[in-house]
């Protein structure tokens, strides 16, 4: 596609809660424990993609449009009901929260590779990552013309069939597609298909669809928003306090300070199980109800966890 489509594309992110839940839970913990921390981080394209001309300009325009977002009373009411573990002061903070386009700036080099630099307080920029990734993903489909060829009816059928396969075979599943989606509409279609499949086959399924990471879509379909934390929380602490040695210990302590026993599934593998095990005391093992396996062989990791406990 030609550069002149930049500037004509509608706003991609239209709701403050069109984001993954764990960005809000981590933002709350960061504000509570590290309100003055300054961060700098960079977008990395693992595939070294060459983006169309004008792509970075449109990314910047879409980031600028985020400044218009304001959390609504309906969004806050939903989160207070479903995300009861988030302290009420956080919603007061969110009522006054506004994005600033200066926190993230995109550019392209002469070869067309995309660069995005994030700068600012951790408490503020933490709510940009997933939204910016969703913008990049959707714009890529628009700029390459793939979005115009998308068959939404077929996609619904495929999503419904996938849900049926998992649910009929006893799987417990949730949807985590915000940063990877081809568009907000396609993610909504996928979540809707999973919801409908679960409802239509309620007497036959042995599995369950427990929710989505996307808070806005959870509100739209009245399901549970899913998520606790990302590696970012542990790695950010490691960056501030001298590396991985005590990062898990401090992350668990700060998480407990904010959530007082709620949200007790800990993401342990930022620096591997052995480093985590050095920091996981008996009190931590008793207070965190579960561990999230996010790397390595699941069975091998599960055996390590069982032996440790």
Which residues make up each language-model segment?
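Ordered alpha/beta subdomains of enzyme catalytic regions
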Residues: 1-251, 256-258, 282
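Glycine- and Gly-Pro-enriched alpha-helical subdomains that act as flexible
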Residues: 224-304, 308-309
């Amino acid at each position: 596609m030609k550069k002149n489509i930049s500037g004509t594309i509608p706003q991609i992110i239209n709701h403050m809660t069109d984001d993954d839940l764990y960005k809000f839970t981590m933002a709350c913990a960061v504000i509570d424990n590290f309100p003055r921390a300054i961060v700098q981080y960079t977008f990395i394209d693992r595939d070294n993609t060459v983006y169309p001309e004008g792509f970075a300009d449109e990314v910047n325009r879409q980031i600028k449009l985020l400044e218009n977002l304001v959390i609504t009373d309906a969004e806050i009411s939903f989160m207070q009901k479903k995300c009861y573990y988030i302290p009420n002061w956080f919603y007061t903070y969110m009522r006054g929260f506004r994005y600033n386009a200066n926190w993230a700036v995109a550019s392209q080099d002469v070869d067309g590779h995309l660069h995005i630099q994030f700068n600012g307080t951790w408490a503020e920029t933490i709510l940009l990552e997933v939204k910016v990734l969703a913008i990049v993903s959707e714009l890529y489909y628009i700029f390459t013309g793939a979005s115009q060829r998308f068959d939404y009816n077929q996609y619904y059928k495929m999503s419904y069939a996938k849900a049926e396969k998992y649910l009929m075979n006893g799987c417990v599943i949730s949807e985590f597609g915000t940063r990877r989606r081809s568009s907000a509409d396609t993610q909504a279609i996928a979540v809707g298909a999973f919801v409908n499949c679960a409802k239509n086959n309620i007497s036959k399924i042995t599995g369950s669809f427990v929710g989505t990471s996307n808070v806005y879509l959870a509100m739209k379909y009245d399901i549970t928003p899913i998520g606790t934390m990302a590696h970012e929380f542990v790695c950010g602490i490691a960056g501030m306090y001298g590396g991985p040695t005590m990062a898990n210990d401090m992350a668990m302590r700060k998480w407990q300070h904010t959530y007082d026993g709620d949200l007790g599934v800990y993401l342990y593998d930022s620096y591997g199980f052995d480093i985590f095990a050095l920091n996981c005391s008996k009190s931590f093992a008793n207070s965190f109800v579960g561990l999230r396996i996010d790397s390595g062989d699941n069975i091998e990791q599960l055996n390590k966890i069982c032996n440790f406990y």
